[in-house]
């Protein structure tokens, strides 16, 4: 039986991406990033949606070319319906619907957060994917949550941030340090040359599995303001140690709750997903727990950590196999609950 060929389209934030999947195998995964947001210290929604309009056709054409297929071979089109920036989502949704009509191919809506988690089932991402049930720490600039994954489309959020996401905390603290946006990768890189024990910052005291990252941001801000009064060059002179200390603090907060959830539920299958899953300290903490706690860990390839269409195509493939299609009246939504099947 010939494998289905599915196009995935991702446009939830500031990356325009398209991918082709056949079965569980990714044939192409193309992305256009938007450097324009760096000078503003964050994503500007209006600029993002305009850039998507410019990028979406060349990105899709390139993904088809790289996959070495013809456009009429596409069996279905998967697109990110949400959550995300509404203007950005509308570009991808509208184009997906138009292309589906043109090709007379079925349309498949995809939840962006589910896609991050289910990227672990891409063939080249993980030859041995997680076994159900598993826990997935999903961490990005917009979301931080512990998800109990019972089946492909049966997921339960058992813990989440009550304020800032972990990636957002990295970016806001990076702004305090006068680092470029996005600050997370820069903090990670500078941490390699710093001492993680040089400075200590407050940790939240929350019951259960929920997170809070607004406290560490405030703690760092007050600490820096105090030190700059004594030495205006304090940040510049201590940037590596500051980055290493902040990174250690944030990763410890993330791992403490994840360890508690895994212990309470008796689950050893543990995955991470989302942009912050590229962080070297988080990956190292997972590897240490593999040895210390006997976890079976699942760490995504770097190309599947940030927003990408390969993960959208993967979910679309799973829904295609189930015959779960969307109709042309489907609209983008900025809020889209994770456990919506």
Curated annotation (Swiss-Prot):
Known cofactor(s): Fe(2+)
Name of the protein described by the UniProt record: tRNA N6-adenosine threonylcarbamoyltransferase
Subcellular location: Cytoplasm
Keywords noted in UniProt: Acyltransferase, Cytoplasm, Iron, Metal-binding, Transferase, tRNA processing
CDD domains to which the protein is assigned, alphabetical: ASKHA_NBD_TsaD_bac (cd24133)
Annotated EC: 2.3.1.234
tRNA processing in keyword set: yes
Lineage: Bacteria, Pseudomonadati, Bacteroidota, Flavobacteriia, Flavobacteriales
Top EC category: transferase
Matches recorded under SUPFAM superfamilies: Actin-like ATPase domain (SSF53067)
Native source species: Riemerella anatipestifer
Name of a matching Pfam family: TsaD
């Amino acid at each position: 039986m010939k494998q289905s060929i599915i196009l995935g389209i991702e446009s939830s934030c500031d990356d325009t991406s398209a991918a082709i999947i056949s079965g569980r195998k990714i044939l192409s995964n193309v992305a256009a990033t938007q450097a324009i947001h760096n000078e503003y210290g964050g994503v500007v929604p209006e600029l993002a949606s305009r850039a998507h309009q410019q990028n979406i056709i060349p990105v899709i054409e390139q993904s088809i070319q790289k996959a070495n297929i013809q456009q009429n071979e596409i069996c279905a089109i998967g697109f990110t319906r949400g959550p995300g920036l509404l203007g950005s989502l509308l570009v991808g949704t509208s184009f997906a619907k138009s292309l589906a009509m043109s090709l007379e191919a079925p349309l498949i809506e995809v939840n962006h957060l589910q896609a991050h988690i289910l990227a672990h089932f891409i063939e080249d991402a993980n030859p041995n994917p997680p076994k159900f049930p598993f826990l997935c720490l999903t961490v990005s600039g917009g979301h931080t949550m512990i998800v109990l994954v019972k089946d492909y489309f049966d997921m339960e959020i058992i813990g989440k941030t009550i304020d800032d996401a972990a990636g957002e905390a990295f970016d806001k603290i990076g702004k305090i340090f006068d680092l470029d946006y996005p600050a997370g990768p820069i903090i990670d890189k500078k941490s390699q040359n710093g001492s993680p024990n040089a400075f200590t910052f407050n940790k939240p005291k929350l019951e259960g599995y929920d997170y809070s990252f607004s406290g560490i941001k405030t703690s760092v801000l007050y600490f820096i303001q105090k030190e700059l009064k004594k030495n205006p060059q304090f940040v510049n002179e201590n940037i590596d140690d500051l980055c290493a200390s902040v990174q250690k603090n944030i990763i410890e907060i993330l791992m403490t709750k994840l360890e508690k959830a895994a212990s309470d539920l008796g689950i050893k299958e543990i995955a991470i997903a989302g942009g912050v899953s590229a962080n070297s300290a988080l990956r190292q903490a997972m590897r240490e727990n593999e040895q210390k706690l006997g976890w079976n860990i699942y760490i995504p390839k770097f190309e599947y950590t940030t927003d990408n269409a390969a993960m959208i195509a993967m979910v679309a493939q799973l829904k295609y196999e189930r015959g779960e299609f969307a109709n042309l009246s489907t609209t983008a939504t900025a809020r889209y609950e994770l456990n919506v099947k």
